[in-house]
Amino acid sequence: MKIKKGFVLREVCGEQVIMGEGLGALDFGKLLCLNETAAWLWNRAVGAGEFTVDGLAEDLCGEYEVSPEQARTDVAAIVAEWQKVGVVE
């Protein structure tokens, strides 16, 4: 998977929000606020170019004290949300 071109993480009123660059790509019904961990994962995914749930889960285990099973469950849920709003392909 990869992050679709044109979507970026921005801070809006103290919140980390995924949004489309340019007004044509912006759909306020599909803005997604991220917590600190999800924003960290987003930045890892952007930096990687291509990513997998397992790869991000492994990265998460290296950064936070979390079991591999819990990391995979959490990453899968976050990536599912990204897919739901159409920011990954």
Residue spans of the language-model regions?
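Long, charge-rich, low-complexity alpha-helical segments
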Residues: K30-E89
